[in-house]
Amino acid sequence: MSAKKTAIESLMGERGHLRTSHEMLKAALEIESRDDSFVPFYIATANYMEAGMGRLDAQDVRMLSRLAEKLGNMSNDEEEIIAEVHRRLDGNRDHLKKFLTCRDALVADETDQKNIANFESVSNAYIDYIHNSMGHHAPSTDIAIKLFDDNDWNDIADIDPEYFSGEQKLYVTQLAVRPDSVPLGKEAAEYVAEYRRDREE
């Protein structure tokens, strides 16, 4: 992408990569002819999502804190909008903890069929939660876009070259062990391009 990304576009790109990661996992779990060769992909995906979801959580907490500061004396509706996102984040942390526990069991024994079945079951539940509770545009984001300036978005995005370097390595590892039958998702740049098009309409 030729133009330099803004902080909010960096956020969109990060979340696009994360979405691609869990959508590839969803696609893998829908393949009937799965076998033990999928396990390295499961582990690599969990490693990527551990980093990505941890960062998403920290960014969203900063955004909600800044939003509360900007709003000041909030209405009941505004308080509920922020509280609802906190509830989603709490649920995401609970699912992520279970997901990573299953990942750790797989790392300890990649051939144990019970470990594989548990990981797949917990992964399906987690992906359902992400799609139903984390994947749609929240009213808090609309308010933030109206109230925040570039400095706010820079603080929230916390653009960190060291993190991006590590994230890229995790993503490359995930792709390297992706079974051929699992389709590739979109690149982060495609999500940023979509965001730019939406802003122009």
Describe each model-derived feature in a short phrase.
Residues 1-54, 59-201:
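Small-residue-biased structural context
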